[in-house]
């Protein structure tokens, strides 16, 4: 089926209207452009823009980024790969050494084990090369759809929609979808967002979620999307 290029918004206070996802992304970028004290690029975007654009480094960065601040993720990724230059070295690393390097990041015990396991599987099953198919990525321990989709987008430039808490929250607030979890949000976004926007959607939504559409006390007055935002409308009522 051909992807729809327009999205029907579910605003409870206005008649349904059609709006291009391009308009939403452009309004987000405009708000971010004129925002003060803007945080830097997301950790994954920074890794993508590095000269080597190493898929393995992006995979490990994605694993480390779960429930971690981007600035901390970037710092830990750099520190980890200063010691272990490639997948083979990490596959042979002592888990306790990995823990000592990433201990300042959330869930470092679990993540250290995951990094070691993932590295060994990539060496033994995929000949040291990070797979570029979602089915193969999902076989890796601790790798779910969000992580797999992030690797596809940021490492291989393959169209996918990584849905994290920011993408899920914003999509529901502005009425693009009406879903209860990230899995359903991804399913709905795939249906209604033109594939040509899949590569950029995550990075823009995440930046917006980190800086403007915060989970608590969002900066609604700065937002160019408040006219279609159910959250903002409900806040005004109260």
List PLM regions with ranges.
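N-terminal polyanion-binding entry modules of DNA glycosylases/AP lyases
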Residues: 1-132, 196-197, 204-238
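Generic solvent-exposed, charged/amphipathic alpha-helical segments
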Residues: 25-29, 168, 190
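Catalytic DNA-binding helix-loop module of base-excision-repair DNA glycosylases/AP lyases
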Residues: 59-64, 115-123, 130-175, 185-188, ...
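Amphipathic alpha-helical protein-protein interaction surfaces
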Residues: 69, 143, 156, 160, ...
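A general structural motif at alpha-helix termini
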Residues: 91-94, 102, 141, 152-155, ...
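Short, charged hinge/linker segments at domain and secondary-structure junctions
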Residues: 165, 180-183, 224
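Short basic/hydrophobic patches in alpha-helices and adjacent helix-turn junctions
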Residues: 172-176, 191-195, 207-211
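Pocket-forming structural segment of enzyme catalytic cores
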Residues: 179-197
């Amino acid at each position: 089926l051909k992807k729809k290029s327009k999205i029907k918004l579910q605003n409870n206070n206005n008649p349904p209207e059609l709006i291009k996802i391009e308009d939403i992304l452009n309004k987000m970028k405009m708000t971010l452009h004129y925002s003060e004290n803007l945080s830097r690029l997301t950790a994954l975007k920074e890794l993508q823009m590095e000269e080597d654009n190493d898929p393995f480094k992006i995979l490990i960065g994605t694993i480390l980024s779960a429930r971690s601040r981007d600035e901390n993720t970037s710092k830990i990724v750099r520190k980890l790969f200063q010691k272990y230059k490639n997948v083979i070295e990490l596959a042979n690393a002592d888990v306790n050494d990995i823990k000592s390097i990433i201990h300042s990041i959330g869930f470092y015990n679990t993540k250290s084990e995951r990094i070691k396991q993932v590295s060994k599987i990539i060496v033994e099953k995929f000949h040291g090369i990070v797979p570029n198919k979602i089915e193969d990525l999902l076989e890796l321990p601790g790798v779910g759809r969000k992580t797999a989709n992030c690797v596809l987008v940021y490492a291989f430039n393959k169209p996918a929609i990584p849905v994290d808490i920011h993408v899920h929250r914003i999509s529901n607030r502005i009425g693009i979808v009406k879903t209860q979890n990230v899995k359903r949000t991804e399913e709905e976004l795939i249906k209604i967002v033109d594939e040509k926007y899949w590569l950029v959607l995550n990075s823009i939504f995440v930046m917006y979620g980190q800086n403007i559409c915060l989970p608590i006390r969002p900066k609604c007055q700065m937002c160019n999307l408040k006219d279609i935002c159910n959250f903002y409308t409900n806040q005004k009522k109260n």
